[in-house]
């Protein structure tokens, strides 16, 4: 159905932190992707790492993240890893690593866990090592509109959500809200459809980490 609409699917490998089990199935999983036209995967490691005693940011897991990226490169598959270690430029060596989460992304905003200044700091910390899948694009900021029992509020605006597509660099961007919310603001959603994913030139015009940031970017291969 997606192919009939000209849409490519991205597979999600949520490992539930069962890493050895994931490694045992990597070749079959990647081959299944190739056979069925998937060329990208979003991997996740939610929970305490199995085997017990290993941790998300330890050497053992760092070796695993690298192994998964190398294995994906063998199958010409792009990787967007969540709950992984903050990158340190590895995407230069393995450009199929098109993004990582590796910091508090948009999901924490619904938990009330990100301060409003959080995204003025990330470009000088997390994003130094590589692109970040921040998953912006939340248009409905009142969580009780979806779940009456949840009175949390995303401390943001539509304008700020759109700005994140430029400020939080990633060659893979998400539209993280539901279609019904985008249908209410089609003019704003048009920006998400049109905004570039990669850039020829970037200028940080002004910034005070923790307070504000102004970025100008030139879209790759165009005059935009």
Write out the residue ranges for each language-model feature.
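Residue-level marker of positions within ordered structural domains that often coincide
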Residues: 139, 172, 221
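Residues embedded in well-ordered secondary-structure elements
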Residues: 156, 205, 216-217
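Short, well-ordered loop/turn elements at secondary-structure boundaries
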Residues: 4, 74, 169, 220-224
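C-terminal catalytic/substrate-binding lobe primarily of soluble NAD(P)-dependent oxidoreductases
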Residues: 142, 147, 155, 188-195
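Aromatic- and carboxylate-enriched substrate-binding clefts and catalytic-loop regions
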Residues: 1-153
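Catalytic cores of secreted or luminal carbohydrate-active enzymes
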Residues: 159-209
């Amino acid at each position: 159905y997606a192919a009939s609409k000209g849409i490519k699917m991205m597979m999600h490998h949520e490992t539930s932190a069962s890493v050895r089990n994931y490694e045992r199935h990597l070749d079959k999983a990647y081959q299944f992707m190739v056979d069925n036209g998937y060329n990208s995967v979003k991997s996740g490691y939610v929970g305490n790492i199995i085997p017990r005693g290993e941790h998300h940011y330890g050497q053992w897991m760092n070796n695993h993240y690298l192994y998964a990226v190398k294995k994906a490169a063998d199958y010409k598959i792009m990787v967007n890893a969540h709950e992984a270690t903050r990158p340190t430029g590895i995407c230069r060596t393995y450009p199929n690593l098109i993004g990582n989460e590796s910091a508090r992304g948009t999901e924490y905003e619904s938990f009330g866990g990100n301060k409003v200044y959080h995204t003025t700091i990330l470009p000088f910390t997390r994003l130094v090592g590589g692109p970040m899948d921040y998953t912006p694009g939340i248009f409905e900021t009142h969580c009780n509109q979806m779940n009456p029992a949840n009175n949390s509020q995303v401390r943001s605006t539509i304008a700020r959500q759109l700005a994140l597509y430029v400020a939080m660099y990633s060659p893979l961007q998400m539209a993280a809200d539901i279609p019904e919310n985008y249908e209410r603001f089609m003019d704003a959603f048009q920006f998400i459809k049109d905004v570039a994913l990669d850039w020829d030139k970037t200028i940080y015009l002004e910034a005070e980490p923790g307070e504000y940031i102004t970025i100008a970017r030139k879209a790759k291969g165009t005059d935009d």
